Every structure is written in structure tokens, then in C-alpha cells.
């Protein structure tokens, strides 16, 4: 049995993807028999500390100023005495403009000499493409701030979600390895009866936020052509919040609704999402291929062993095109092999499996090194 402390910005339910990630990881580590302390450093209301699989308790004040909050965290860490601290980092969660200048110093002060694993969910802006001068300067400052973070926290290991980030960190002298994201949708073997009833349709699914830069064309035209070739109608559903991509969805419906049946189902419980994934023929990812590994929604579809169509293949700015980690999932690109890949995966049996248990075991393995 090990003791793990997980530090992140927020642990409230539905606050953001990293909060979901941290809570699920803590629960899985506890399921595997370990004791876990989970702390939301920046959380200003609600329960910002949780214990898993332990009798530890803490009296908390969510309205503390930052110095008082740090001292309370230091006391909690000292009392819990973890063998490893896992820091789940996103720059914009810890400071205005994504520049938390002293966060590394503060983290190292509260954990003392405990070994630390850094999971960098985001690095800095301007990664996917060049930007205007103001954004470029912000990204440059964030990169310098990240270098300082590494110097201050002295991590035992650094994890990222995708190979593009590994290359970016190599360029600043940091050795990192890929720890694949797990989805926040528990994997089931249930198929949604409503979606399954459309047996004469080719059923595609978009889950969660739609990237505002994603373009439905020419994918929609190719899908219509493929559906016609196998004598099926075409159906696209959206499950969950579309985020900043609501206008993309609305414009897509306006343009293609004469040839495609669209259904925006909105938010729903995780069990229904899993059932829809099991009933859909394909998933559609709106993130670029180079950064697909950092998409939690893509991770959920891939854990359900869905063939996932990726239309964006622009290079990752400054490191070029980067392929996903080997064996990460079944992808269909919008290239000359599109129809062949669509036919190959249609109706194939699936081997659904959550990555969460493997990720938790990898965290424990750090203690063994």
C-alpha cells in the first residue's frame, strides 16, 4: 500500500476536465488499495480537500487567503506523509494570463522534500499554430514561466498526454514521457436502444466540446458519398456540451440538414454517453491529430474502441506533424485512404477498456524506481 497526495487547482464536480481527471485518478488509486489525499489548491468554495481509503480528516476553511491556504496545505501534507506527490498542472488554472510566477516555489515549500510527479496537461499558448504578436509574447512568457516551474519543483518525473508535448519539452531541456489520458466516461458494454434502432443509418457521434476552428467541410461531403455507396442514410449526433463550438454545429446543421439527420442531445449522465458510443459506428474528433492525445473526449471514444475520424492535420507549431503514441487508437484520416478505412472499421467487433487502472499503476511504479 502506498500514500499518494494529488495537488491540482480545483476538485469540484464539473468544474473542468483536470478536476474530473484528478478525482477519477484518486478514486482508482484507492480502489487499488492505496491511501490518497486530493487537494484543490485554488478552489474558493465547497470541499477542497478529500481523503480516499483512509481515516484522516481535516477541518477546512474555503475562504482562506493564499498564504493561509498554503500553510494549511503544508500541515495536511505533513500529517498525511505521502510517499509521492502528483501535481496536475494547467497554467491558466493557477494564475491570470497563465503566468503563476511563484507556484513552483509554493508547491515545493508545502511538500518539503517529498518526491513529485508533474503531469503537465497544458504547456503554453501558441503550440498548435502561429498567432498574433500579443498572443505570441504571452506564449513566450508562459514558456519561460514553465522553465522556472521545473527549476523550482525539481520533479522526479514529468508526464504529458501526447508526443508533441514531449518534443516541445525536449527543446527546453526537459525529459518527459507520455502518460495517456483516460476518459471521464466509465466503459460499459450497454448499447443505446434509441441509437441502435436506426439500423438503416450510418451513425456518427461528436462528444463534448467542438473546437471552434474545426471545419465540417469536406468531411460532410465525403460522409454523404460513403453512406450512399453502402445504401445507408447519414446521421450525426452531438452528446454533451458543445462549448465554444455551438456556432460551428449550428452552421453545419443549416448547411447540410437536407442530406444529413442531426441530433444535439445535450448533457446527459455518463452511462448514457457510454451506451451511445457503443451504438455509434464512428466518432468524430475536432482536435488536430498532432494534439489528439490531450483530448479527453477523444480518449473516451478510444476507450470504447470507436474508430475516430480526425480531419485536422495541421502541424504542431515549431515541432511539425507529430503522430499519436503507438497503439493509441483506431484513427481515420481525411486522405486518399478514407473510404477504405471507413469500410474496414464498419461493423468490426470492439474491445472496450478503460486506461484508468493502467495510469494509476504507472503512478505507483514511480515509487518503485
Residues covered by each model-derived region:
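Donor nucleotide-sugar binding/catalytic pocket of nucleotide-sugar-dependent glycosyltransferases
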Residues: 148-207
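N-terminal strand-loop element at the rim of the active site
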Residues: 8-13, 24-80, 241-245
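Acidic donor-binding loop of glycosyltransferase active sites
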Residues: 277-292
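Nucleotide-sugar donor phosphate/pyrophosphate-binding loop at the beta->alpha transition
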Residues: 117, 125-149, 164, 185-189
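Nucleotide-activated donor-binding/catalytic signature segment of Leloir-type glycosyltransferases, i.e.
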Residues: 248-271
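A charged, aromatic-enriched C-terminal amphipathic alpha-helix characteristic of glycosyltransferases
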Residues: 32, 335-369
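Membrane-proximal helix-turn-helix segments that form the acceptor-binding/catalytic region
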Residues: 105-112, 135-157
Amino acid at each position: 500500500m502506498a500514500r499518494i497526495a494529488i495537488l491540482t487547482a480545483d476538485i469540484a464536480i464539473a468544474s473542468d476536465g483536470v478536476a474530473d481527471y484528478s478525482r477519477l485518478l484518486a478514486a482508482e488509486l484507492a480502489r487499488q488499495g492505496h491511501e490518497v489525499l486530493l487537494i484543490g489548491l485554488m478552489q474558493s468554495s465547497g470541499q477542497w480537500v478529500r481523503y480516499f481509503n483512509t481515516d484522516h480528516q481535516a477541518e477546512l476553511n474555503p475562504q482562506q487567503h493564499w498564504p493561509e491556504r498554503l500553510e494549511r496545505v503544508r500541515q495536511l501534507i505533513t500529517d498525511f506523509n505521502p510517499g509521492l506527490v502528483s501535481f496536475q498542472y494547467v497554467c491558466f488554472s493557477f494564475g491570470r494570463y497563465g503566468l503563476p510566477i511563484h507556484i513552483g516555489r509554493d508547491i515545493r515549500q508545502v511538500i518539503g522534500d517529498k518526491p513529485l510527479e508533474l503531469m503537465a496537461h497544458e504547456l503554453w499558448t501558441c503550440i498548435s499554430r502561429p498567432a498574433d504578436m500579443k498572443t505570441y509574447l504571452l506564449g513566450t512568457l508562459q514558456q519561460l514561466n514553465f522553465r522556472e516551474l521545473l527549476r523550482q519543483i525539481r520533479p522526479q518525473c514529468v508526464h504529458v498526454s501526447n508526443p508533441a508535448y514531449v518534443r516541445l519539452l525536449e527543446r527546453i531541456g526537459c525529459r518527459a514521457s507520455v502518460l495517456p489520458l483516460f476518459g471521464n466516461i466509465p466503459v460499459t458494454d450497454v448499447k443505446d436502444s434509441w441509437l441502435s434502432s436506426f439500423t438503416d443509418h450510418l451513425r456518427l457521434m461528436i462528444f463534448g466540446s467542438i473546437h471552434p476552428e474545426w471545419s465540417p467541410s469536406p468531411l460532410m461531403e465525403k460522409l454523404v458519398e460513403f453512406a450512399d455507396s453502402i445504401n445507408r442514410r447519414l446521421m450525426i449526433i452531438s452528446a454533451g456540451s458543445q462549448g465554444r463550438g455551438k456556432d460551428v454545429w449550428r452552421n453545419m446543421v443549416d448547411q447540410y440538414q437536407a442530406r444529413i439527420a442531426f441530433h444535439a442531445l445535450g448533457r446527459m449522465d455518463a452511462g448514457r454517453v457510454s451506451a451511445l458510443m457503443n451504438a455509434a459506428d464512428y466518432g468524430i474528433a475536432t482536435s488536430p491529430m498532432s494534439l489528439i492525445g490531450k483530448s479527453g473526449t477523444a480518449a473516451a471514444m478510444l476507450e470504447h474502441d470507436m474508430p475516430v475520424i480526425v480531419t485536422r492535420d495541421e502541424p504542431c507549431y515549431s515541432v511539425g506533424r507529430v503522430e499519436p503514441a503507438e497503439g493509441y487508437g483506431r484513427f481515420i484520416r481525411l486522405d486518399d485512404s478514407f473510404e477504405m478505412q471507413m469500410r474496414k472499421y464498419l461493423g468490426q467487433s470492439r474491445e472496450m477498456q478503460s486506461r484508468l487502472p493502467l495510469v494509476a499503476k504507472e503512478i505507483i511504479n514511480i515509487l518503485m524506481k
